[in-house]
Swiss-Prot record:
Name of the protein this chain belongs to: DNA polymerase epsilon subunit 2
Similarity-based family: Belongs to the DNA polymerase epsilon subunit B family.
Organism in which the protein naturally occurs: Homo sapiens (Human)
Transmembrane segments: none
Gene3D superfamilies, alphabetized: 1.10.8.60, 3.60.21.60
Record keywords: DNA replication, DNA-binding, Nucleus
GO BP term, example: error-prone translesion synthesis
GO MF, any single term: DNA binding
Function per UniProt: Accessory component of the DNA polymerase epsilon complex. Participates in DNA repair and in chromosomal DNA replication.
Note: In eukaryotes there are five DNA polymerases: alpha, beta, gamma, delta, and epsilon which are responsible for different reactions of DNA synthesis.
Length: 527
């Protein structure tokens, strides 16, 4: 393509996005795109502009250095995707993105005025934590077909079925009765026995005497869509529902190839055709999930030996072992006992060379394992405990709780917490519908876009690291390792499983096959 035409196309593309190029920058860009065919040019320019917008820009005048960095990012060799096949991402390594309401997009932390996260959070971090939870749900709800404003000139029947979200400030500012209002807010109990709805603009007292609850577990500190009428400073609720969920494909259609999940890839692995091909070709790949692996129990170790013997001819890609790793928590000898138990486990693994050399082992700590209290995200088991095991089993990773696993284009979130009981105990009203508890539970987690939609006194969180507990965009597989009965359910194109407590459920565990996204229930009882 003629350099002048190329230059003109590039300038126009940048101008359409509100960006201007300096002379040196356009000269460099024209040279870099010289070998690109006319058919590919538009796609390539869009990728470069996206990469430019991801950088911290001081103005809309783009320098050469910014364009150089963007071109370099877009021209990375496809062969580099080989190192992106399998990655374990700890909670403290997850990238943080902040939603910008003005630009209607997620910005990396560096492009915002937020400080770097710190375990010793400030009051601002605590307020920001709830504000960000609200903002994510608000933008998701606003884009849902029921809440998008009707198109001008549309049929009256179409516009009649649309809803409009109101803020609490709007309600409180009215001196007359407001009928049929829908508000997105968080349920709080500011006074004992009295529930309030809270959003960034204010709080309003609720009257729940006539409220109908749709399916889900409605706990304090969860976000709801409340429908009702407002009179005399009280919001009388007719119905409670959760914010609508959204498949990850829909989220990515709006926000492009941002890598929300984490890992070495600059862009979302979902866009990689090469990784997708590898995933489909490797039909033997499997992930084995176990929870409550009590390594101090002889019977548990025997069952693990039987399992390894069974899998030895065709070793799984990965064993994900979740805590607690001791049946007797705490105590002065717990650390030494756990070191000895891990030594015994290493002995068993070494008995099966195929598994020892081929399979990866991921250890996710449980709530009663040695560590820093019960605040989430929880760091890995201490190196002093795991050192010897890691030397003997090199393909082992001791990670955080929760953690994320990326395999080819699939995203897996693993969380070890006895969450079902906690959420049932803290319900504003226990569900009366015939839906099974796991269905209520999974719907709640995905609707909230968060792993722990509970008050902080029930499930404490490091305020500045709350983003590490997000379930947005929705992963392909969500593993909630809970002592509740094992279950497998699908919601919003997300497969949700609970392997159950290994010793308490007759030695049951779950096996996931990424090539066809299926889960197999397995049990070692009777062996």
């Amino acid at each position: 393509m003629a350099p002048e035409r190329l230059r003109s196309r590039a300038l126009s593309a940048f101008k359409l996005r509100g960006l201007l190029l300096r002379g040196e920058a356009i000269k460099y860009l024209t040279e870099a795109l010289q070998s690109i065919s006319e058919l590919e040019l538009e796609d390539k320019l869009e990728k470069i502009i996206n990469a430019v917008e991801k950088q911290p820009l001081s103005s809309n005048m783009i320098e050469r250095s910014v364009v150089e960095a963007a071109v370099q990012e877009c021209s990375q060799s496809v062969d580099e995707t080989i190192e992106h096949v399998f990655n374990i991402i700890g909670a403290f390594d997850i990238p943080r993105f902040v939603y910008n309401s003005e630009r209607k997009k997620f910005l990396p932390l560096l492009m915002t005025n937020h400080p770097a996260p710190n375990l010793f959070g400030t009051p601002r971090d605590k307020a920001e934590m709830f504000r960000e939870r609200y903002t994510i749900l608000h933008q998701r709800t606003h884009r849902h077909e029921l809440f998008t404003p009707p198109v001008i000139g549309s049929h009256p029947d179409e516009s009649g079925s649309k809803f409009q979200l109101k803020t609490i400030e709007t309600l409180l500012g009215s001196t007359t009765k407001i009928g049929d209002a829908i508000v997105l807010g968080m349920i709080t109990q500011l006074k004992e026995g009295k529930f309030f709805l809270e959003d960034p603009t204010g709080t309003v007292q609720l009257d729940l005497s006539k409220a109908q609850f749709h399916s889900g577990l409605y706990t304090e500190a969860c976000f709801v869509l409340a429908e009702g009428w407002f009179e005399d400073q009280v919001f009388h609720v007719n119905a409670f529902g959760f914010p609508p969920t959204e498949p990850s494909s829909t989220t990515r259609a709006y926000y492009g190839n941002i890598n929300f999940f984490g890992g070495p890839s600059n862009t979302s692995v979902k866009t990689s055709a090469k990784l997708k091909q590898l995933e489909e070709e490797n039909k033997d790949a499997m992930f084995v999930f176990l929870s409550d692996v009590w390594l101090d129990q002889v019977e548990v170790l025997e069952k693990l030996r039987i399992m390894f013997a069974g899998y030895s001819p065709a070793p799984p890609t990965c064993f994900i072992l979740c805590g607690n790793f001791s049946s007797a928590p705490y105590g002065k000898n717990q650390v030494q006992a756990l070191k000895d138990s891990l030594k015994t486990l290493a002995d068993i693994i070494c008995e099966y060379p195929d598994i020892h050399q081929s399979s990866r082992f991921v250890f996710v700590p449980g709530p009663e394992d040695p560590g820093f209290g019960s605040i989430l995200p929880r760091p890995p088991l201490a190196e002093s405990i795991t050192n010897e095991f890691r030397q003997r089993v090199p393909f082992s990773v001791f990670t955080t709780n929760p953690c994320r696993i990326q395999y080819c284009t699939q995203e897996i979130t693993v969380f070890r917490e006895d969450l079902v009981n906690k959420m049932c105990r803290n319900c504003v009203r226990f569900p009366s519908s015939n839906l099974a508890i796991p269905n209520h539970f999974v719907k709640t987690i995905l609707s909230q876009g968060h792993l722990t939609p509970l008050p902080l006194y029930v499930c404490p969180v490091y305020w500045a690291y709350d983003y590490a507990l997000r379930v947005y965009p929705v992963p392909d597989l969500l593993v909630i390792a809970d002592k509740y009965d094992p279950f497998t359910t699908t919601n919003t194109e997300c497969l949700c499983i609970n392997p159950g407590s290994f010793p308490r459920s007759g030695f049951s565990f779950k096996v996931f096959y990424p090539s066809n996204k299926t889960v197999e229930d397995s049990k070692l009882q009777g062996f």
